[in-house]
Structures are given as structure tokens and as C-alpha cells.
From Swiss-Prot:
Enzyme class label: hydrolase
Keyword Magnesium: no
Sorted UniProt keywords: Coiled coil, Hydrolase, Nuclease, Nucleus
Exonuclease domain: residues covered: 125-275
SUPFAM superfamilies: Ribonuclease H-like
EC number: 3.1.-.-
Top-rank taxon, per record: Eukaryota
Protein name: RNA exonuclease 4
Gene Ontology biological-process annotations: rRNA 3'-end processing
Molecular function via GO: exonuclease activity; nucleic acid binding
A Pfam family per the record: RNase_T
Record organism: Dictyostelium discoideum
Subcellular localization, as worded in the UniProt entry: Nucleus
GO cellular component, one term: nucleus
Length: 298
């Protein structure tokens, strides 16, 4: 019995030793694998470091070569500086550049009634400019009207005798005087009738047309109006709002005379040039505004 107990104890001790040896072997195996992995990582990192080093060396050589070339070659700018054209000062020059033959003089253009009857069909669009004088009640009224056809030809220009008493001829802005109005003026109602007949159902180009039509006491379909104050391309770039005809002409046509005197013929023709130069984009703008069609700038 005692021999059997001793045998069992000895077997247990041997089993315990075997278990311990097994654990030591497993532990050693894990350590070996870890070392192998580290060696593999270190090997990859060394390869990467070598590649980076080679790239840096190549970059440094290129940089040094460029510096040598730069020091050996005198500096010359490759940037092309666009020279600004001098502003056009002479209105006749502007007309010539845009193939418009329309003499600017002080003579009014008063077509006969028969000619007026045929003017509407003679042009696809008309340009208009109105000069406003002041009457009693601190109100504005029509003092002069000028109309040009699609070719920039002045077809109608008349001074208007208002129905109310004139308080201020606003000569600085209209060029009108008491003598001119009394001597050359035509009754307002006659001018209104003639202008309506000329413009009926036609595209109308101008600057601040709402104001002009108000003083003419005429209605015109909004979709037929080409008002430079409403065309966003002509907005003042600093304020993003409507701009004066003088500023638009300077920016769009490079036209900037030394003296911008009140001249209805000049302003009317400028409106024709502006419209013809931007017609495709302007019509696309109107199409989008009234019909909701996308603007095609191509």
C-alpha cells in the first residue's frame, strides 16, 4: 500500500515537471516569433528609410541644379502684361469702331407724319433717351426725346412743350433753355402720340426706361424692355447695383470723353451699341427672367 502511494506521488511529480517544460517551450516559441516579427519590421523600415534618403538626395540635386541655372541666367519675366488701351475720347471714333454712321449735331430730327407711319416697321428694336425738366409741384416732365433705330441712326428727336408751367429747365442736365423750348418745342400730346406709334410692340433699349416711360405717360410690355439699369452685367462692380450710363460706357465700351455734356443723340446711340454688343447674353437674361429658361452664354 505504501509503495503504491509513493509511486503515485512520483508520477504526479513527473507530470508536473513535464507540464512546466511544456509551458517553457511555448513561452520560448512566442518570444522567438516576436523577435522574428521585429526583425522583419526593422528590415522593412530600413528599406523605406533608404528609399526616402535616395529621394531626398535626388531632390537636393535638382534644387542645386536649378539654383545654378538661375544664377547663371539673367532674370526675364514670362508673364505677359496686357497693356490697357487708352480710353476713347471722341464719340465719332466710337461710332466708327461699331460701324455706326450718325452725325451728331444740334439739329432736331422731325420726320413727317407719313415717315412716322413707316418707322415702326423699319427696325427690330429702338433706343430712346429722354431729358426731364421740372414743372410746378416739384414734378418732372418730358423736355426732350430722342429715338434711334437698330443701325444707330437718329430717326426722331423733338423738344417738348409741357402742359404745365416750367419751373426749372435743368439746363446742366438737359441742354434746354426757355428760348429753345418756346421756339422749337412741340406740344406734349403730339409727341406722345408719335413716339407711341414708332415704338409700338418693339424691343425698347435705354437707360432707366421706367423713368422715361413714366414721363412719356406711356405703357410698354416689360418683356420688351432692355433697360441697362436692370441688366446685371452692367451693375456697378463695387456696389452690385445699377450704374450710370457714363460708367457703363467707360467700363463696357472704353468710352470716356473729357466732357460728358447733356446729349440725347450720343446717349441714344450708346444704348444701341451696348445692346448690339451684348445682345445674345442680354436676350438670354430676359428669357430666363420672364420665361424661366436657363441662361445659355455659349
Amino acid at each position: 500500500m505504501r509503495k503504491t502511494v509513493r509511486k503515485n506521488k512520483q508520477v504526479k511529480r513527473e507530470l508536473a515537471l513535464l507540464e512546466k517544460e511544456k509551458e517553457e517551450i511555448e513561452s520560448f516559441t512566442k518570444v522567438s516569433k516576436t523577435v522574428e516579427n521585429k526583425q522583419s519590421i526593422n528590415s522593412n523600415w530600413n528599406v523605406t528609410k533608404e528609399k526616402i534618403k535616395n529621394k531626398n538626395n535626388a531632390y537636393q540635386k535638382k534644387k542645386e541644379a536649378k539654383l545654378k541655372l538661375k544664377s547663371a541666367t539673367p532674370y526675364t519675366s514670362t508673364k505677359v502684361i496686357e497693356e490697357k488701351k487708352p480710353h476713347i475720347k471722341d464719340f465719332n471714333q466710337l461710332c466708327q469702331e461699331h460701324n455706326i454712321i450718325s452725325p451728331i449735331d444740334d439739329n432736331l430730327v422731325s420726320p413727317t407724319q407719313k415717315e412716322i407711319d413707316n418707322l415702326n416697321e423699319s427696325s427690330k428694336f429702338f433706343s430712346i433717351d429722354c431729358k426731364i425738366i421740372e414743372i410746378e409741384g416739384n414734378k418732372g416732365t418730358l423736355g426732350k426725346v430722342c429715338i434711334a433705330n437698330q443701325n444707330g441712326q437718329i430717326i426722331y428727336e423733338k423738344i417738348v412743350k409741357p402742359m404745365d408751367k416750367i419751373v426749372d429747365f435743368r439746363t446742366k442736365f438737359t441742354g434746354l433753355t426757355r428760348d429753345k423750348v418756346q421756339r422749337e418745342g412741340t406740344d406734349f400730346l403730339q409727341v406722345q402720340k408719335e413716339v407711341e406709334k414708332i415704338l409700338r410692340h418693339k424691343i425698347l433699349v435705354g437707360h432707366d426706361l421706367v423713368h422715361d416711360l413714366k414721363n412719356l405717360k406711356l405703357a410698354h410690355k416689360k418683356k420688351l424692355l432692355r433697360d441697362a439699369t436692370q441688366f446685371t452685367k452692367f451693375f456697378n462692380p463695387d456696389t452690385n447695383s445699377e450704374d450710370s450710363l457714363k460708367s457703363i460706357a467707360k467700363r463696357e465700351l472704353n468710352f470716356s470723353p473729357d466732357n460728358w455734356d447733356p446729349n440725347g443723340k450720343r446717349d441714344t446711340i450708346i444704348n444701341v451699341i451696348l445692346y448690339k454688343q451684348n445682345q445674345k447674353e442680354w436676350e438670354a437674361f430676359i428669357n430666363n427672367k420672364f420665361y424661366g429658361q436657363p441662361i445659355d452664354k455659349n
